[in-house]
Amino acid sequence: MSTAGVAAQDIRVPLKTGFLHNGQALGNMKSCWGSHSEFENNFLNIDPITMAYNLNSPAQEHLTTVGCAARSAPGSGHFFAECGPSPRSSLPPLVISPSESSGQREEDQVMCGFKKLSVNGVCTSTPPLTPIKSCPSPFPCAALCDRGSRPLPPLPISEDLCVDEADSEVELLTTSSDTDLLLEDSAPSDFKYDAPGRRSFRGCGQINYAYFDSPTVSVADLSCASDQNRVVPDPNPPPPQSHRRLRRSHSGPAGSFNKPAIRISSCTHRASPSSDEDKPEVPPRVPIPPRPAKPDYRRWSAEVTSNTYSDEDRPPKVPPREPLSRSNSRTPSPKSLPSYLNGVMPPTQSFAPDPKYVSSKALQRQSSEGSANKVPCILPIIENGKKVSSTHYYLLPERPPYLDKYEKYFKEAEETNPSTQIQPLPAACGMASATEKLASRMKIDMGSHGKRKHLSYVVSP
């Protein structure tokens, strides 16, 4: 079945005498629609003339005939008015005679592939993500729907044309290496029958090889290599899932972190947000400053300002020891004693109770208690009948009893020699006064020599 027959059945416009055998139908079909330019822009945007692929000379003759008929076709729709409407069942499919050449059979096979594609895709003349070159208006079926003869069925108008334009922009940015990487495992496939419309191609796994830098060449593409003026789009669109995944890897806040898994070194790598040069460089870490010195929490006093306590880490400084000086010693030598006037030290006070400071009652109490015998007694040191020192003496806790015998002997001597007054040995007792002590000492010094020897022998230890 030719392209004109497919279009007549899909658009559901009755054609009575518009079809001619041997491929002459397209010329008369132009007269059924008023404006042939709109039809060429909308329906022939799939480039059916180019899709004939120039297989053989009979096909070329048909194409030239179609071109002449298109030029000579009238611009008005009076031919359609003369023909009149007819039911859709009276439209038999156009069958080409078996006398056609083998090239015409291949053309029919190719056109059968367009049969299912043109059912839902008449308004969408191009598969998704293909560059539109010959369609000037974004809504191609608007001119066809303006006809008042018989309204065409409502075809799904694309709401995401802007999305397709954005997809084409993304496609321009992510061509060659990335697309080849994502689609390198897919094999070239022939026309898919029972293919749904453009919207339903999502998830079908179809691939459009027209976007490749080095597309896979098929037998039909080799045959149409002579026509360099037209671009032959392959009706199989690329899988949108791969482009979605590609879009996600190049957009969003995490786009700079998602890199392709494998990079092809032979292909030139385009500058993209996933390149390593665009990554923000982490500045070097600033070294941590040393901890400040511990503040002084003590009270503000003389200790804080002193040099001794200025540094807490070190112990307080101890002044060096000076050599011991004899003058500061606690036990000085006799040579360092101070010299008194005339070289004589004043007499030492005795420990006996002095009657000047002790009351008579205290003395009576001591005598009544029998403490008179325990009064300390002071004996001077006498050598050779002379008192040796006025500062040193013997301190006895009490009067010794043998002094009474000596005192009795002194009395007998005095009686025998009355001219010599010999006093008994003075014993500075608690009851003797200071004047009596001095008088007794003077008397002892004036005593005889023999007695002094005796006294010195007795008293000195």
UniProtKB/Swiss-Prot annotation:
Keyword tags: Acetylation, Cell membrane, Cytoplasm, Membrane, Nucleus, Phosphoprotein, Tumor suppressor
Keyword set includes Ribonucleoprotein: no
Polar residues bias spans: 265-274, 325-336
Signal peptide positions on this chain: none
Ranges of Pro residues composition bias in the record: 283-292
Modified sites of kind Phosphothreonine: 126, 130
Gene Ontology cellular-component annotations: cytoplasm; cytosol; nucleus; plasma membrane
Inducing factors: Up-regulated by lysophosphatidic acid (LPA) and sphingosine 1-phosphate. Up-regulated by globular actin monomers, via MKL1 signaling. Up-regulated in uterus in response to progesterone. Up-regulated in uterus in response to estrogen. Up-regulated in pregnant uterus.
Disordered: annotated segments: 228-353
Start and end residues of each stretch annotated as Interaction with EGFR and ERBB2 and regulation of EGFR activation: 333-362
Tissue spec. comment: Detected in lung, in airway epithelial cells and alveolar type 2 cells (at protein level). Detected in uterus stroma, luminal epithelium and glandular epithelium.
Topology term for the membrane: Peripheral membrane protein
Domain of life: Eukaryota
Inactivation phenotype: Embryos are present at the expected Mendelian ratio, but half of the mice die before adolescence, due to defects in prenatal and perinatal lung development. In the 15.5 dpc embryo, lungs are smaller, have a less complex structure than normal, and present fewer blood vessels. Lungs in newborns present abnormal patterns of cell proliferation and apoptosis. Adults develop chronic obstructive pulmonary disease (COPD). Mice present epidermal hyperplasia with thickening and flaking skin and ulcerations on tail and footpads. Papillomas develop at sites of wounding.
Subunit structure: Interacts with EGFR. Interacts with ERBB2.
Protein name, entry field: ERBB receptor feedback inhibitor 1
UniProt gene name: Errfi1
